[in-house]
Regions:
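A metal-dependent hydrolase signature that marks the N-terminal structural subdomain at the beginning
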Residues: 1-153
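Alpha-helical scaffolds flanking conserved acidic
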Residues: 154-162
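Post-HExxH zinc-binding segment in Zn-dependent metallohydrolases
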Residues: 175-208
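Active-site recognition of the HExxH zinc-binding catalytic motif
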Residues: 162-174
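Functionally constrained cores in energy, signaling, and assembly domains
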Residues: 125, 169, 184
């Protein structure tokens, strides 16, 4: 997912891979609702906070959301394999917020895991610093009378989930069009923000 909503599959460049190798990467397994796939997050050592935020969003925020938001993705979970690898990066050279990795383009980690388990493993990547700065509804956010730090935390959590679900839908339903998938993830973002702003800040989200 790009800021302008153009989706591409991207393989990190040589320099980015070399830098990640020098820094090292860590893995974390996330469990959520019983019908939701496990997420195996692979992240750079300086991405610990982003990995923890994704874990909280996927394992706690998403399952606790109201039925209207969750129903947008009712058909998603049965169409995905039991494990989805999520490669976290600060940013992508192409500017995309995330990519889905079609069969044959997975990382060595995902291929090795699929071989060891004996069944399919899906993979996506998320550019967490780019997602942090992404604000798809700036006027609605500005209309909430809250401290900037409070709104930034909520926006980041909602945006992480929206981009995650966007790329997972591309994996599960490769024939669905980008406008259809984008429309659903934007609607999810709006509903997620409305819920979180109401519950955590006691305010209304959006422009009256």
């Amino acid at each position: 997912m790009r800021r302008k909503s153009l989706v591409r599959v991207h393989v990190p460049g040589l320099f980015a891979r070399w830098r990640q190798w020098l820094r090292g990467r860590k893995q974390k397994l996330i469990r959520a609702g019983e019908n939701m796939p496990l997420l195996l997050i692979s992240y750079p050592r300086d991405g610990e906070a982003a990995a923890a935020e994704l874990e909280a969003a996927y394992a706690h925020t998403l399952p606790a959301m109201g039925g209207q938001a969750r129903r947008l993705y009712d058909s998603l979970w049965p169409a995905l394999p039991a494990i989805v690898v999520v490669q976290l990066r600060p940013s992508n050279p192409c500017g995309c917020l995330g990519h889905h990795h079609p069969p044959g383009s997975e990382s060595r980690l995902a291929r090795r895991l699929a071989s060891e388990l004996g069944h399919a493993v899906a993979e996506i990547d998320l550019a967490y610093e780019s997602i942090r700065s992404w604000c798809p509804e700036p006027l609605s956010s500005l209309a909430v009378s809250a401290a900037p730090a409070e709104m930034e935390a909520l926006r980041f959590r909602a945006a992480l989930l929206a981009v995650l679900l966007h790329e997972m839908e591309h994996l599960a339903f490769p024939d669905r069009s980008e406008p259809e998938i984008r429309s659903r993830s934007r609607e999810f973002y709006r509903q997620a923000m409305a819920e979180m702003v109401a519950q955590e800040l006691g305010r209304d989200y959006g422009i009256a």
